[in-house]
Amino acid sequence: MRQHRIVLLPGDGIGPEITAVAKLLLDALGHQHGFKLNFEQHPIGGVAIDASGSPLPASTLEACQASDAVLLAAIGSPRFDALPREQRPETGLLSLRAGLKLFANLRPVTILPALIDASSLKANVIKGVDLMVVRELTGGIYFGQPKGRIEADGDERAFNTMTYSRTEVDRIAKVAFELARDRSGKLCSVDKANVLDVSQLWRDRVDALAANYGDVELSHMYVDNAAMQLVRNPRQFDVLLTGNLFGDILSDEAAMLTGSIGMLPSASLGSEGPGLFEPVHGSAPDIAGQDLANPMAMVLCAAMMLRIGLKENDAARALEGSVERVLAAGFRTGDLMSEGCTQLGCAEMGEQLLQAL
């Protein structure tokens, strides 16, 4: 029997509730599809600060590094807002990404038929949308040097540096090309090569790598046009590749095509070692412990983990199918409620998903 070592990081807020749902379904899928998941649970974020004083204990990082995949629920609590930034729960996530050497962030955006009316865009615009934003996570203007604020000539000036190396562009582009090859074979690289030198290097390297992927149709688009096209005609896209700053903005824009942040998973990958799979939503401390959380994003993270991290494609498809069937049957958590639907709590939604498997 195939065995996989999984680290669960429930974290803060609603994290434990949605983690319990994901684990329930993953255990069932293992029995159905002939594999066993060996789970370890470790603290991160606010709960880790409470227990050990650190948002990422060394034991948590070591367990993650030794795993096959990491499933993280949520990090953050207003209780820690008064702490210096480097001591807050969120720094645990940044340290985890660094410790796992993750550089590629994947954000899928899929419009499910049962939720098409949840979007603020017209149904005829978003029907059939199924795209993936691939964002470079560790370079670009967020990390470039020099940066800072200075006083000079009686004025104050602030500056940041947008920089990418050939190596950084090549490794993220390879991730996007491979994803496009496994999907519809279409890749759109987003840059600002008409203005920025760094984008000209980006485009040159993506073009150079395209020679190795003759089965992938490559196009380029300036970021301002891409932002417009995501709203005007999102169906034209399959895989979108872009840098850290542009990807930060475009992935949030694309996410809102769905109409609910409670349905959005993500993955962060490195060249080797385990991937990190986490919902886009936060820890929602205002509803924590009340059985009100929507577990769907966490469940879809589990599906991404099965497909990308563990290569258990049949189980991933089964889990995604259960989500579609439960929504089609009219079951909703409070954040997705609409007329004629049946409202469920987090645990009840988990039971419905289990039955739908």
Swiss-Prot record:
Gene3D superfamilies: Isopropylmalate Dehydrogenase. Keywords: Amino-acid biosynthesis, Branched-chain amino acid biosynthesis, Cytoplasm, Leucine biosynthesis, Magnesium, Manganese, Metal-binding, NAD, Oxidoreductase. PROSITE patterns: IDH_IMDH (PS00470). It catalyses: (2R,3S)-3-isopropylmalate + NAD(+) = 4-methyl-2-oxopentanoate + CO2 + NADH. Substrate binds at R97, R107, R135, D224. One of its GO terms (molecular function) is magnesium ion binding. One of its GO terms (cellular component) is cytosol. Binds 1 Mg(2+) or Mn(2+) ion per subunit. Its main location: cytoplasm. Its cofactor is Mg(2+); Mn(2+). Pathway: Amino-acid biosynthesis; L-leucine biosynthesis; L-leucine from 3-methyl-2-oxobutanoate: step 3/4. Belongs to the isocitrate and isopropylmalate dehydrogenases family. LeuB type 1 subfamily. Homodimer. This is 3-isopropylmalate dehydrogenase. It comes from Prochlorococcus marinus (strain MIT 9313).
